[in-house]
Swiss-Prot record:
Pathway linked to the protein: Phytoalexin biosynthesis; pterocarpan phytoalexin biosynthesis
Main location (coarse class): plastid
Membrane topology: Multi-pass membrane protein
Protein name (database record): Glycinol 4-dimethylallyltransferase
Record-stated family: Belongs to the UbiA prenyltransferase family.
Keywords assigned by UniProt, alphabetized: Chloroplast, Magnesium, Membrane, Plastid, Transferase, Transit peptide, Transmembrane, Transmembrane helix
Gene (name only): G4DT
Catalysed reactions, as listed in the record: (6aS,11aS)-3,6a,9-trihydroxypterocarpan + dimethylallyl diphosphate = (6aS,11aS)-2-dimethylallyl-3,6a,9-trihydroxypterocarpan + diphosphate; (6aS,11aS)-3,6a,9-trihydroxypterocarpan + dimethylallyl diphosphate = (6aS,11aS)-4-dimethylallyl-3,6a,9-trihydroxypterocarpan + diphosphate
Length: 409
C-alpha cells in the first residue's frame, strides 16, 4: 500500500469520505507510525502533506467508505482543524460518464430538434411546400410532363423557399423577443432555449443557403421570388426608421398578399413552365384562379394572425387590425375573407371542362367553407388558446385548398 501507514481501528479516528467530507480531530492524542519508525514533532507537517497527497492518489472501486488511520509516535493536540478531501476516482467516474453519454447525447439532440421545430414555424413551411406543388402542377398539360426532371424542378423551388422562411422566422423572433415573451413564450428565443447569438447565426446561415442554392439553379423566376419575399418580410420585422412594417396594418397585409398570392404561385408556375418544361411564358386561367383564391385567403390570414396576440401588441405599440378594430370585428372580417376564397374555389371548379374535376373541386370547396363556418361559431375570442387553435385550423383548411386548386384546368 502506498500510504506508508497502518490502517486499523481507533476510538477517535480520522475519517476520509467522498464528496467534500472532512477530517475531524478533537483534543486527542494519536500515534503516528510510519514503517516502524518514530517521527519527530518537527516533521509532522511534512508527513501530513504526504498523507494528504497519498489520500488523493488512493483509488477504490467505491468511494463511499470511511478509512481510519492510526498515528503513532509523538503526541500533539489539534483544535477544530478541518481538512477537505477531494476524492478522485478515475476509473469508476470515467465508466459512469461513458455509460451515461449516449442517453445524454440523445436527449440533447431531441431538445435541439424540438427547439428548432418551433423556431422555424412548421405550419408555414408545410403551406409553402404545398403551394409549390399546387402551382407547379398547374403547368402540367399531359401526364408525361410529370417526370424526374419535374420533381427536381419542384425541389429547386421548395428548398430555397424553406431556407428563406427559416431566416425570416429568425429575424422576426430576434426583433420580437420581448413581445414573444408575452404572446408566444413557448418559442425557443423567448423561452431562452436559443440565445440571441444562436438566433443570429441560424438566420444568417439559412439566408446564405437560400440565395446560394437558388443562384446555382440559375432560375430567374425563383431568384426574383426570393428577392421580393426576403426584402419585404425583412422590412416587416426589423426595427429601423421607415421599416418595421408590422406596425402598419395595411402594409402588413400587403406583405402577406405579395408573398402568398403573387410571388409564390407565379414564380413556381413560371419556373416549371419556362425553366423545367421549356415552354413559353404564359398566364393560364387556372393560375388566375389560384391567385384570386390566395388573395382573399392571405387577407384573412393577415387579419387573423394577430388576434391571439392582442395583449403583447398593445403593450409594445403594434397597431394591428385586431388592435385597431377589436378582436370580434377583426375575427368575423377574416372569416368573411376565407369564405370568399372558397367561393373563388367553387367558381373555379364550375369552370372546369372535365365533369368529375368540376364536381370534385366545386363540392370540395363548398365542404371546406361549411367546416370553416361551423368551426368559427365555436371560437371563444376571450380565450387565447381558442383563438390560437382556430388560427392553426385555417392553415389546415388552406392545405386542403391547395390540393383542390391544383386540379383546376
Amino acid at each position: 500500500m502506498d500510504w506508508g501507514l497502518a490502517i486499523s481501528s481507533h476510538p477517535k479516528p480520522y475519517s476520509v469520505t467522498t464528496g467534500g467530507n472532512l477530517w475531524r480531530s478533537k483534543h486527542t492524542t494519536k500515534n503516528i507510525y510510519f514503517a516502524s519508525s518514530w517521527i519527530s514533532k518537527a516533521s509532522r507537517h511534512k508527513r501530513e502533506t504526504q498523507i494528504e497527497h497519498n489520500v488523493l492518489r488512493f483509488q477504490q472501486p467505491s468511494l463511499d467508505h470511511h478509512y481510519k488511520c492510526i498515528r503513532g509516535g509523538s503526541t500533539y493536540q489539534e483544535c477544530n482543524r478541518k481538512f477537505v478531501v477531494k476524492a478522485i476516482s478515475k476509473q469508476p467516474l470515467g465508466f459512469e460518464a461513458h455509460a451515461s453519454n449516449p442517453k445524454n447525447i440523445l436527449d440533447s439532440v431531441k431538445n435541439v430538434l424540438s427547439a428548432f421545430y418551433w423556431f422555424s414555424y412548421p405550419y408555414t413551411m408545410i403551406g409553402i411546400t404545398l403551394c409549390a406543388f399546387s402551382s407547379s402542377l398547374l403547368a402540367v398539360e399531359k401526364l408525361s410532363d410529370i417526370s424526374l426532371s419535374f420533381l427536381i424542378g419542384v425541389l429547386q423551388g421548395v428548398l430555397p423557399q424553406l431556407f428563406i422562411e427559416i431566416y425570416l422566422c429568425g429575424v422576426n423572433q430576434l426583433y420580437d423577443l420581448e413581445i414573444d415573451k408575452i404572446n408566444k413564450p413557448h418559442l425557443p428565443m423567448a423561452s431562452g432555449q436559443f440565445s440571441f447569438k444562436t438566433g443570429v447565426i441560424i438566420s444568417a446561415a439559412f439566408l446564405a443557403l437560400s440565395f446560394g442554392f437558388t443562384w446555382i439553379t440559375g432560375s430567374w423566376p425563383l431568384i426574383c421570388n426570393l428577392v421580393v419575399i426576403a426584402s419585404s418580410w425583412t422590412a416587416y420585422s426589423i426595427d429601423v426608421p421607415l421599416l418595421r412594417w408590422k406596425r402598419y396594418p395595411f402594409v402588413a397585409a400587403m406583405c402577406m398578399i405579395s408573398t402568398w398570392a403573387l410571388a409564390l404561385p407565379i414564380s413556381y408556375f413560371h419556373h416549371m413552365q419556362t425553366v423545367v418544361l421549356k415552354r413559353p411564358i404564359g398566364f393560364p386561367r387556372s393560375l388566375g384562379f389560384l391567385v384570386a383564391f390566395m388573395t382573399f385567403y392571405s387577407l384573412g390570414l393577415a387579419l387573423s394572425k394577430d388576434i391571439p396576440d392582442v395583449e403583447g401588441d398593445k403593450e409594445h405599440g403594434i397597431d394591428s387590425f385586431a388592435v385597431r378594430l377589436g378582436q370580434k370585428r377583426a375575427f368575423w372580417i377574416c372569416v368573411s375573407f376565407f369564405e370568399m376564397a372558397f367561393g373563388v374555389g367553387i367558381l373555379a371548379g364550375a369552370s372546369c371542362s372535365h365533369f368529375w374535376t368540376k364536381i370534385f373541386t366545386g363540392m370540395g370547396n363548398a365542404v371546406l367553407a361549411s367546416i370553416l363556418w361551423y368551426q368559427a361559431k365555436s371560437v371563444d375570442l376571450s380565450d387565447k388558446a381558442s383563438t390560437g387553435s382556430f388560427y392553426m385550423f385555417i392553415w389546415k383548411l388552406l392545405y386542403a385548398g391547395f390540393f383542390l386548386m391544383a386540379l383546376i384546368r
